[in-house]
Amino acid sequence: MNRRRERVVVVGAGLAGSLVALYLARQGHEVDVFERRPDPRSALGRPEGRSINLGLSARGMRALDGVGLLADVLKHSVPMRDRVVHSPDGGIRTQPYGVREHEILHSVLREELISLVVTAAEAEPGVRFHFDSLLASLDRETGTVDVAPTAGGETRTVTADLIVGADGAFSTIRQQMQHGLRANYAQEFLPWGYKELTIPVDADGQPRVRLEALHVWPGHEAMMIAHPNRDGSLTCTLFMAHEGPVSFAALDTPTAVRDFFRQRFPDAEELMPDLVREVTEHPVGHLVTVRSDPWRYADRVVLIGDAAHAVYPFYGQGMNSAFEDCVVLDECLTAHPDRATALAAYEAARKPHTDVLADLSTANFEDLRDRVHRLGYSASAAADRLLARLLPQHWVPLYGMVAHTTIPYADALARAKRQDRILRQAGAGLALVTVLAATAALRAGRRRRANRR
């Protein structure tokens, strides 16, 4: 973007919109952010049972670090070092997230993170947030938007040099920007939805399960994931079909709720004293993947985050990839004085990789649902980690590349496929020898460290 002070309108004050406002303000621009919902820092902006906790990983951490927010955000997070898998028979299996000490995730409440980013952006000179403000229309040719109070009132027209659509998976900016263009758009709803539940602290104020981990209750017809919170509680997300014999619709009585949990998640049912009320009262959310192009129009309009590429939450990369959009857009606007060139470079740099992320997120849903509790899955993941320890410069598991590096998603998948081909070509025998050698080397290393103590 040119170095002169320009006016930017951001539509959407969620995670991506708030962070991109901060990045653009740091470039010296005047930024107005319009959001149809109330201020997320207010009680009205925090409805109960409507969010999935966030797993902050390397891409999101890099974006927050770029504006000096990472340290503050980490203070509001809980480290997740492992995935703890709960079986219906009561068995528990632990799967580390990485092979090195720093390769962990950080659990943070969505509303806390949004509040931190909004407050930081609002403190920048020239940044103004307009909550309870509904986008009425976009004129892509003139770079204007019409906005009106959600409670009713006078519509006003705002003109900007650049309009950023950060208004979510069902983006109005995207719809109006692409209207009449040779645009591609695909939307796919998962037959499953989600509902937020809680594992509170016990009577002594202590966590009921191990806190520094993501807890997973897999299942082919229903599964549950629990993120830790700083107060010792866990926020659970129950995933299952909207309709059918095993579905949210079928959990229509207290008895049905209790029987369902006792059969499928028996150890979890004991940890959730408010289970029946939460299942009965909390809303069911929808899960959608969105692919579209173009992401920009001329030098005036651009999409980021879910407005450009919504994905299922099962790889934990929705927020991280949206934050990465902010970094790449900032870099492209800095590198290219011509804004149209910058926006084209941004889309070219991001879209191939977010398309791959959509595929990875769908595949990880199937893993979490059907395979994560199987011994073969655990053995394969363990072999991957052992090879990474033995050959750190040459072997990186796919999950590690996605979560613990900023390697572009498509590049990470291509490298993982090459690694898989190597194992297949080497044959099962050589792979077993390699894993056994890696195990022996690791054990020897542990003995040496113990002797030094």
From Swiss-Prot:
Which Pfam families does the record match to this protein?
FAD_binding_3 (PF01494)
Enzyme Commission designation: 1.14.13.9
Q: Which GO terms describe its molecular function?
A: FAD binding; kynurenine 3-monooxygenase activity
Q: Annotated pathway, please?
A: Cofactor biosynthesis; NAD(+) biosynthesis; quinolinate from L-kynurenine: step 1/3
Gene3D superfamilies named among the record's database cross-references: FAD/NAD(P)-binding domain
Question: What does the UniProt keyword field contain?
Answer: FAD, Flavoprotein, Monooxygenase, NADP, Oxidoreductase, Pyridine nucleotide biosynthesis
Return the SUPFAM superfamilies for the record.
Answer: FAD/NAD(P)-binding domain (SSF51905)
Question: Quick one: a GO biological-process term for this protein?
Answer: quinolinate biosynthetic process
Q: Would the keyword Oxidoreductase be found if you checked this record's keyword annotation?
A: yes
The record's similarity note reads:
Belongs to the aromatic-ring hydroxylase family. KMO subfamily.
Q: Mind telling me what this protein is named?
A: Kynurenine 3-monooxygenase
